[in-house]
Curated annotation (Swiss-Prot):
Stored CDD domains: GH32_Fruct1-like (cd18624)
Organism in which the protein naturally occurs: Oryza sativa subsp. indica
Protein localization: Secreted, Extracellular space, Apoplast; Secreted, Cell wall
Top-level lineage group: Eukaryota
Family: Belongs to the glycosyl hydrolase 32 family.
The name this protein goes by in its record: Beta-fructofuranosidase, insoluble isoenzyme 2
EC number in record: 3.2.1.26
Gene of this entry: CIN2
Gene Ontology biological process terms, A to Z: carbohydrate metabolic process
Function comment: May play a role in sucrose partitioning during seed development.
Amino acid sequence: MGVLGSRVAWAWLVQLLLLQQLAGASHVVYDDLELQAAAATADGVPPSIVDSELRTGYHFQPPKNWINDPNAPMYYKGWYHLFYQYNPKGAVWGNIVWAHSVSRDLINWVALKPAIEPSIRADKYGCWSGSATMMADGTPVIMYTGVNRPDVNYQVQNVALPRNGSDPLLREWVKPGHNPVIVPEGGINATQFRDPTTAWRGADGHWRLLVGSLAGQSRGVAYVYRSRDFRRWTRAAQPLHSAPTGMWECPDFYPVTADGRREGVDTSSAVVDAAASARVKYVLKNSLDLRRYDYYTVGTYDRKAERYVPDDPAGDEHHIRYDYGNFYASKTFYDPAKRRRILWGWANESDTAADDVAKGWAGIQAIPRKVWLDPSGKQLLQWPIEEVERLRGKWPVILKDRVVKPGEHVEVTGLQTAQADVEVSFEVGSLEAAERLDPAMAYDAQRLCSARGADARGGVGPFGLWVLASAGLEEKTAVFFRVFRPAARGGGAGKPVVLMCTDPTKSSRNPNMYQPTFAGFVDTDITNGKISLRSLIDRSVVESFGAGGKACILSRVYPSLAIGKNARLYVFNNGKAEIKVSQLTAWEMKKPVMMNGA
């Protein structure tokens, strides 16, 4: 880092410590409401079967209570801001406010007082998700959904402004008297009308944003609204896009470079600058309320018609996902400090609500990810932000050129693995043993993984990692690949099909845990036999990135044996083909100095 870098780091660390003292009371626990929530959840709630040591070490999390959607992430005057849906009174959903945390590095966080709470007629019964937009003068504006009726979730869109734009911490927000600024008129379903996006400014001087909705019984819709002043908004004649997927929550719409660069693009600049517009594609992401996952398409934005057209006509059917695991309500933002786009996503617990109440916390945010367009132009790539590497221990454990024979597993020793970062490069000896893919499962990775889990012997694979494993392997979470020959279609030969799967079905001996397999197909060419995997392990989180970020899976697991020093890490191969570990590098991960006062 150097002397100057060290001094700068210490300077902002001192700032954060002072802020933490000022913000010490920002997360207040109301024990009486937690008791009420517990009583409503179960009769006589016992102590949680989730061990306290399974609380995450380096993922974003407040000290107590419930969190869900990340809201309005931004970079402002040297500080990263994250707002998020938060219940200050308990570990179940309810009493939602916009909690607010700030950071210099996206790793160490200090919680400030809530930024937005129910306080006006337009949000008296709920302050739900929304986004931030940087105005022309660099000042942020927040648009968010309010609920304004007690009898029904009648949803309107409101605006909030910083009281003092010169405050880099944006500690106070005000709601103008003209709220709500957007209401569900013209036949819009008022109970399914929420989560405004970051706005973008067109060459005509109008700001535009999207609001997610449901048309009829099953059509997800992204309505376009226009405004010159962020006060008076007009709905466009046609939606930006729609598809028969069910309700679209938390829409996100942003440009990505299409010329091979990994740089992010500011949401507005790509529209105003015609030259830049020619070098970008657009991403439309929606969170599916019924299925509880996020999917996206890559396509073209027609600014004159105000329509978005996916490059793949079947994109809304095939559902490319940010993450094939426990990851929802995501939101991106452009980081001008490092010219990158960063993705946040919420990961809920997989235990019971009664356990959440008993242990006193529920929900985390995934590690922030840098996202950019794959050179193929067909999908995004995702990778943990570089800052997370600062938490790595000084001395990694390295395993090189180790052949793992069929049916063999190899323990990785020399470090504690309950909180670790593992990168591994595999080489498959031969693809000849690959099984033929069942045509019935050609588009259903989840079903395929459930049927052919980590312990089901195969041809090429399953091979990968057993993480958070107990010494006797009674508990283990498997993250693995399996390679298939393509399903026969007219006798033609295609490239091998790669399945990535996380199998937590043996992750815990505790009962009543939600332990589904998660899986996705990896759009990669493995004909050279090479593929990589990275897993961030954090006590009760396994967050994995396959083939350089082409497929991602986050899973929540709650071992009863593989906890702390008792957690083990293995490389395994349950296929017929030999697998070589070209290189495995594993680091113990430290805790951040500050995590919202926890």
